[in-house]
């Protein structure tokens, strides 16, 4: 009975965990790496076709996005997820496949002119459709049995519609162990969805640490803040453009705007129009409504019971076709435009930036995280111009942001989730956080809760029956390609040496408190190694 850590170790994206128990082999999540990639990930230790099943925490691409690639490599087994997660994956994986194929077509068209070899997409639409047929819909809070000796329960993680923490009971050799995967833990009091469920018992815990080193601070009154921005922008004759993630954040914005309109918070602009220009966002909004009775919180359900749709209001218009999208920019009235992608690196939002960035009457409002290197981050950091569709556009619009809005719990929320266990777990594995954040949060779990906590690197293996590490992997940093393959190889070898140095320091710290004679012998061994390799010829 063991767990092997594959992805989202000392990194935020690419979640994947491999488990062996009760004679079965299975995964928890199989996500896509997004943004900068700093560490090498261990390959799956078995062929995809040898896996028995997959458990999926939620639909975000960094947890589900590589499932079609798993199917393409031979996996034909079931994927267990909540009803809403299955519904969201149906649109998100198909959308991802479309992007993969479009990018491959574009790169190959360009590459043929330059004589480059054909670029193969990570997966195709056929792969996405194939894997979607294998999804198994599971209710919250009900134990299912994917295999003899393995029991599973999904509980609400409060992060996204359908998101879950997963409780797994494993029985082997008449011994039973419980491991809990936190998934992404949500904020309290988010619009629409319920708060995270706290779990009382676990032998082992694998938990995220996205914001394990920081607090979101006091939560602003978002409808009031948004109303003030709309008012100010409309009063000067401008448009409000909101780059927004299609799934989750767009629905939050609609929820806030419905409140603003209902309460009459924008004066002198009655009946203003709100465009949602993202086919994926429009499909996701429909899925939110279809899963209301299992996923909505009490406040949203009260609205529904009164016959009020929390995500709809007078003046809301959705665009599907590209002609619909283009027509928005010919509407001369003041308006709100919500479009993807949230970081402005793709999608229809780029067209709206082209038409609105240059005008000082307009406002570009960011409502989500902007990664380093993205156009959204550049705008927030004061870019004075932006290249869009081969044209340089001057930035004259007001650039603004709504602070603290996040689907992830901050460090206090994470500690409260971990504190809910009534007895201390045997071990807590901290993952899904930036390199230093995982270590910082693991240390806080030790100091504040007295937990045995570590932040494993990819490839680390842990025996769940014996409660011991079988193999402690070291982080192998990815070396950027250089002009010389020889230089790249040398850099990779040197990085491995540094990784072993980090491992040595870890072992030294673990030996604190050991008998003096053992420490003396350890020190002599290290001294001998240093004497052997201390180079005087360089």
Question: Where are these predicted regions, by residue range?
Answer:
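Generic long, charged, amphipathic alpha-helical segments
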Residues: 387-418
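C-terminal, active-site-flanking charged/polar segments
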Residues: 359, 434-479
């Amino acid at each position: 009975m063991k767990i092997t850590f594959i992805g989202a170790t000392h990194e935020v994206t690419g979640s994947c965990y491999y488990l062996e128990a009760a004679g079965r082999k299975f995964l928890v999540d199989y996500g896509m790496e997004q943004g900068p990639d700093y560490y090498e990930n261990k390959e799956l230790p078995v062929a995809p076709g040898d896996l028995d099943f997959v458990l999926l925490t939620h639909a975000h691409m960094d947890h589900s996005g590589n499932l079609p690639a798993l199917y393409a490599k031979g996996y034909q087994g079931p994927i267990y997820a909540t009803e809403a997660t299955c519904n969201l994956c149906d649109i998100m994986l198909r959308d991802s496949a479309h992007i993969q194929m479009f990018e491959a077509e574009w790169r190959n068209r360009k590459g043929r002119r330059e004589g480059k070899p054909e670029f193969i997409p990570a997966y195709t639409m056929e792969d996405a459709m194939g894997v979607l047929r294998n999804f198994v819909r599971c209710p919250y809070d009900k134990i299912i049995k994917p295999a003899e000796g393995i029991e599973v329960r999904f509980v609400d993680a409060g992060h996204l519609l359908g998101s879950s923490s997963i409780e797994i009971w494993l029985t082997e050799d008449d011994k039973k162990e419980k491991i809990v995967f936190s998934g992404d833990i949500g904020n309290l009091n988010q619009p629409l969805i319920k708060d995270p469920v706290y779990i009382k018992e676990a032998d082992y815990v694998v938990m995220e640490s996205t914001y394990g080193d920081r607090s979101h601070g006091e939560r602003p009154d978002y409808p009031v803040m948004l109303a003030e921005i709309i008012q100010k922008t409309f009063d000067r004759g401008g448009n409000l453009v909101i780059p927004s993630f299609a799934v989750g954040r767009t629905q939050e914005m609609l929820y806030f705007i419905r409140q603003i309109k209902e309460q009459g918070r924008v004066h002198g602009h009655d009946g203003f129009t709100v465009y949602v220009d993202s086919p994926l966002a429009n499909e996701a909004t429909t899925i939110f409504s279809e899963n209301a009775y299992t996923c909505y919180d009490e406040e949203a359900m009260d609205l529904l019971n009164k016959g009020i749709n929390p995500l709809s209001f007078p003046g809301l218009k959705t665009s599907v076709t590209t002609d619909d999208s283009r027509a928005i920019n010919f509407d001369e009235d003041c308006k709100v435009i919500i479009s993807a992608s949230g970081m402005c690196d793709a999608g229809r939002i780029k067209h709206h930036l082209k038409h609105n960035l240059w005008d000082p009457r307009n406002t570009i409002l960011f409502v989500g995280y902007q990664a380093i290197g993205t156009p959204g981050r550049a705008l927030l950091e004061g870019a004075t111009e932006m290249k869009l569709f081969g044209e340089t556009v001057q930035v004259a619009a007001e650039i603004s942001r709504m602070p603290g809005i996040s689907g992830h719990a901050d460090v206090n929320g994470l500690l409260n989730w971990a504190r809910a266990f009534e007895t201390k777990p045997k071990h807590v594995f901290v993952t899904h956080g930036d390199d230093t954040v995982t270590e910082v949060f693991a240390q806080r779990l030790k100091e504040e809760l007295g937990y045995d906590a570590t932040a494993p690197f990819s490839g680390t293996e842990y025996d769940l029956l014996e409660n011991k590490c079988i193999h402690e992997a070291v982080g192998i940093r990815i070396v950027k390609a250089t002009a010389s393959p020889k230089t790249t190889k040398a850099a990779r070898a040197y990085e491995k040496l540094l990784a072993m140095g980090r491992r040595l320091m870890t072992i030294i710290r673990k030996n604190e408190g050991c008998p003096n004679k053992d420490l003396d012998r350890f020190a002599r061994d290290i001294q001998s190694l240093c004497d052997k390799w201390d180079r005087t010829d360089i």
